[in-house]
Swiss-Prot record:
Presence of keyword Cell cycle: no
A cellular component term, taken from the record's GO annotations: host cell membrane
Listed name of the protein: Uncharacterized protein B475L
Region of interest: Disordered: 297-332
Keyword Glycoprotein: yes
Keywords: Coiled coil, Glycoprotein, Host membrane, Late protein, Membrane, Transmembrane, Transmembrane helix
Stated induction or repression of this protein's expression: Expressed in the late phase of the viral replicative cycle.
Family per similarity comment: Belongs to the asfivirus B475L family.
Cleaved signal peptide residues: none
Membrane topology term: Single-pass membrane protein
Coiled-coil intervals: 195-235
Spans through the membrane: 7-28
Length: 480
């Protein structure tokens, strides 16, 4: 045992000797003056002393002053040398580590000493009043004096050493041990760290958003530029289609589509009425040309009743002399009307005169149609006669070549009578004004030729070089 430990034990033994004397001698003497049972009276005196020290401040100060004087006498230290404050520091320092005792104030040491004394007195009084100790203190005191006092001193020293160890550990824990945080503090710390992580994520997302917005702005500018280029190309393509369609005299499909409502393309009626493919239309057009050639072969021979003069070429367009059918399906009517018109020209009747005659006398046309339907063999006989007698047409041509004076007489008659020629010119101008309006662009292409060859009697001549791939230009039709 070192010197420091022996000094502490000597202080603790002096500490215990003072209070054991009070409990064993002083309180026992006070119990003898009472008339009640000495055991019960002694217990009462012990409890009263403990409560007085804890609750009565004056009694505590009186007890402490008495203990101070006792300490000075036992240790043989002069009271002038050991002041009361030094006494308090000496007692308290024996319970605390040196590194902490110097930093604690005197007021703090007074409170520590008060707690130590109150706790010590309470535990010592409880130990003395137990059934094990009380009979030996009250009865047979002289016989049991040494044994009882020795047990009381051992208990006092053991308690003070234990108390010293508790205070040592308490101060050491304050130095090395961090007190655990409360649940609220832990929650605050956890949420603070989570909040910092969220703020970091927000900063990253904000920067990413800025970069994405910049990319979006760039893409939007590119899209607007491409869209403007696309619109310009579509407009140029549309203009090119319009120019090509106008140059080829094809259907104005683009304008037609523009005028249609948005729901028109989904209509079943429109799908039924929609124009057929260009290839199908061209195929039908070729068939029409072949049928026209076949019909012209049947009527290529001129009647024997009319002389055929030398042919002359004139520039003309479709007029009243050539009726235009209104649909592709009326091919037979078109051929019949063309043959009827040729016969009318042979007989010296203009198309305008025939139209006026038909309008004024509709029953005549009905009678003619009914007669043709009832007697189809007459027209077949005429065609068969023309085919069987080609020499009649040759005789007419030969007659015109052998008698040129007839044509000279006609020219002289025109010179002597200019009013007749003026009437002929006016009649031609009227024919030009009455030209039909071609509504079907495919038929317009069909009537495209700028020149046709007619003879002086009004009959057009058929050429043997007529081909199905004709796409416009001069057409010469010669009757042989």
């Amino acid at each position: 045992m070192d010197q420091e430990e022996s000094h502490v034990i000597s202080i603790f033994e002096t500490f215990g000797a003072y209070f054991i004397n009070i409990f064993y001698n002083f309180l026992y003497k006070n119990a003898l003056y009472k008339k009640h049972s000495i055991v019960m009276e002694y217990q009462y005196q012990v409890k009263g002393y403990i409560l007085g020290v804890k609750q009565n401040k004056k009694l505590y100060e009186k007890m402490l002053d008495s203990f101070y004087k006792y300490f000075c006498n036992i240790t043989q230290i002069n009271s002038k040398t050991l002041s009361f404050s030094n006494f308090v520091s000496t007692i308290v320092d024996s319970f605390l580590p040196k590194e902490y005792s110097q930093s604690i104030s005197l007021e703090k040491k007074d409170s520590i000493l008060e707690l130590l004394l109150c706790d010590y007195i309470s535990n010592l009084g409880t130990f003395i009043t137990t059934e094990k100790m009380l009979p030996f203190i009250v009865k047979n005191r002289k016989e049991n004096y040494h044994r009882i006092t020795k047990e009381m001193q051992d208990y006092s020293l053991t308690f003070l050493l234990k108390k010293r160890m508790e205070l040592y550990n308490k101060f050491l824990r304050k130095q090395a041990y961090v007190e655990p945080k409360t649940e609220l503090e832990e929650t605050y710390t956890r949420l603070s760290s989570y909040n910092r992580s969220l703020l970091y994520q927000i900063e990253e997302l904000t920067s990413e958003k800025k970069s994405l917005l910049a990319e979006l702005s760039t893409l939007r500018k590119k899209y607007e530029k491409r869209q403007s280029e696309y619109r310009r190309l579509v407009q140029l393509l549309y203009q090119q289609i319009q120019r090509s369609s106008s140059s080829k005299n094809s259907y104005p499909l683009t304008k037609f589509i523009e005028t249609l409502p948005s729901e028109h393309f989904s209509n079943e009626d429109y799908q039924k009425e929609a124009p057929r493919d260009q290839k199908q239309v061209e195929t039908e057009l070729l068939k029409q040309q072949e049928e026209l050639l076949a019909s012209q072969e049947l009527t290529s021979k001129s009647p024997s009743n009319y002389p055929v003069p030398q042919s002359r070429t004139i520039v003309s367009k479709p007029s009243d002399n050539y009726p235009v059918p209104q649909s592709r399906s009326s091919k037979i009517d078109f051929d019949n009307s063309l043959q009827n018109q040729e016969l009318n020209v042979k007989n010296g009747f203009s198309g305008k005169t025939i139209l006026e005659l038909n309008q004024d006398n509709p029953e005549i046309e009905e009678d003619i149609l009914e007669f043709n339907q009832d007697n189809p063999e007459i027209e077949e006989d005429i065609l068969e006669f023309n085919q069987d007698n080609p020499e009649i047409e040759e005789d007419i041509l030969k007659f015109n070549q052998d008698n040129p004076e007839i044509e000279e007489d006609i020219l002289k008659l025109n010179q002597d009578n200019p009013e007749i020629e003026e009437e002929v010119i006016l009649e031609k101008e009227n024919h030009k004004e009455d030209e039909p309006i071609v509504q079907n662009p495919f038929l317009e292409n069909f009537w495209k030729p700028e020149q046709k060859t007619f003879n002086q009697s009004g009959l057009f001549e058929e050429s043997s070089d007529f081909s199905n791939d004709w796409s416009g230009g001069d057409v010469t039709l010669n009757f042989s």
